[in-house]
Structures are given as C-alpha cells and as structure tokens.
Amino acid sequence: MKYGIESEVCSFADTLGARDGEGESAMGIAEKIKLNYLAFKRLIKEKNSIFCIQRFNYHSFAPYLGHLFLRNKIIFDLDDWEMRENPKYYFGFYPSSKAHFCAREIAKRSVFCISASRFLQHFLGRFNRKVHYLPSGVDTQLFNPAENIPAAEKIVISWIGTFNKMEYIENIDFALRCFVKLRKKHKDIHLDIVGDGIYKDSLVRLVTRFNDSNVRIKDWIAPDEMPIYLRGIQIGILPVRRSNSFNLSKSPTKLFEYMAMQKPTVCSAIGEAMDIVKDGDNGYLACDADMFIKKMGYLIDNSSLRKQMGARARESVEDKYSLGVLCGQFKEILESI
C-alpha cells in the first residue's frame, strides 16, 4: 500500500516463473499460452480491480481477456516500441504487424494510457484521447552520489543498456567510432560497454574489429549495484544513430541514472533526450558524430565542467524525473478515474 492506493504486481517472470531477458525470445507459443492461462486464473479473482498493462507483449493477453470477459477497467502503459517499424494495413484492415493491431486495440479500450516518451504519447493519442506522459524516471534515493568523490585517475566513459535489438549495436558502433577518434588526442580515456542480450556476439565482433584495449565489455549489473559502478565513471553517453520508431520511443532510463549520480552526459539530439537535456546546462546534445566528439572532448578536458554539469543534472532529475515526483503524478491521474 503506497499513496493510499492498494496495488499488486503480477510479473510473469517473478510471479509465474516465466523466462525473461534472453530466455524470453526462446519461448514457444504453447508456453506463452500456458502462462497467460495461469495469469488469467489469478486475475479473475480481482473483479473490481483495475488492470494496468505494462508495455505490449505476450503477457498483455491475460489482463485484456479479463477486461473483455469481466469488464475490469484497463490502463495501457507503453514504454517501448514492440512492433514492426512501419506497419501496414492491407485492404484497410489486415495488419502486417499483429502487435501494432493489438496495441492499438488495447489503447482504444483503456480508461487512459501512459506513455513514457513524447513519441509514444503521439502514437497512443491516435487511439485514445486520454494519454498521460510519464517517463521511466529514477529512484533518486538509490541513485545518490557519494558526497566526497575522489579525483579520477583516468577518464571512464560509459554506455549502459541491453543488446536485444540491432539498433543498440548500431548505436554502440557510433559511440566506438567517436571514441577511437578521441583516443588520438586523449590517450588515457576508457570506454565501458555494460549490459547483456541476444546480440552480444555481434557486439563482441564489433569491438574486436576496433582492436582498442581501452574498450571493455562488462557484464550486466543489477540495479541495486549500479550506483556503485556509476560512482567510478566520469561521463555517460547516449548515442543514437537513426531516427526511427524504436529509438524515438525509448524513455532513457540510463540517462536518468547518470544524471541522478551527478554524471555529465553527451546525448544524440534524437528522441527523448531533446526534452530532458538542456544543451550546455545539465548535459550536452549532439546533432552528428563531429559534434558528439567535440562535446565529449569538452568534458574530458575540464573536470570543473564535469562537476558543475553533473550537479545541474542531479537537480533536473530531482525536480522532474524522480520516482517520488512521478508516483505523485500517477496517483493524481488514478484518482481522476
């Protein structure tokens, strides 16, 4: 019970034992149907509950069926693009993307929708007039910088994420190309690539081609341990190569985490970063590779700039993107039903 609203999470992975991460992609249709059946058996006991469907995937069908048969109200919370890039409707009704069709049907039937990005807000707004923008945000109590951070002996630049989409590999390739150019001038800089996913082998081959000993691939780090890692880096980066639906839809959780830890960031001027980062104030925006390199260079050369920009970044997330602020907004939205 928080904020006076009783709630419960039904996670297919944690509650029902479903495979997640890389394991999810190996699941067959029979396994997914069984899990939805188990979830539906739990949900039919909640006759007066509101079902909040968090992102669209195979797990969405159990609460959707609960809505159809039991008339439970539903809320659709979309924080990612889980559909084909450019879906088409043949003859005006037959979809090339079943996920796109199902997502828009769920949106139409929801009492309201939650979007984690402005792009998704516009997408959902085509099917539901009540769409509220709530980004993923960050737990500012967990992601809290140490008061006395020792001076860095080396500059560590960090990219954090998953490798479950080829777009991520493209974005890392962009970052690597920028990094190797910076290394010509700055010999003692290091790049960490942190995460895991089904395209990790592709990432390893990519990094191997660059043949730079100052680039490290690090395993996935648990959320509770992430603040410890982030205390040891100097710069966070959010490179984005292409302006497509997937990249535009992302709510940049790792950007919020960098900012909460008072780390200055350099972000591509694509997608959500453009609404979060004030260029030159609480971070940097870069419109192309040359500008990305230039602004990373500013931060590498100037420790005072890193400190000042990081402090302003922390203020930004405390004001707008902390879980406390966002949960308060969500409570107000729920009370409006």
Residue map of PLM features:
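Membrane-proximal helix-turn-helix segments that form the acceptor-binding/catalytic region
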Residues: 37-45, 60-61, 65-69, 76-84, ...
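Acidic donor-binding loop of glycosyltransferase active sites
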Residues: 111, 230-248, 263
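Carbohydrate-associated surface elements
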Residues: 119, 137
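Conserved donor-binding/catalytic core segment of Leloir-type glycosyltransferases
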Residues: 149-183, 192
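Nucleotide-activated donor-binding/catalytic signature segment of Leloir-type glycosyltransferases, i.e.
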Residues: 194, 201-228
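Short acidic/histidine- and often glycine-rich active-site loop of Leloir-type glycosyltransferases
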Residues: 248-249, 269-280, 284-285
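Conserved acidic donor-binding segment of nucleotide-sugar-dependent glycosyltransferases
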Residues: 279-290, 298-304
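A short, well-ordered alpha-helix in the C-terminal region of glycosyltransferases
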Residues: 298, 305-320, 326-332
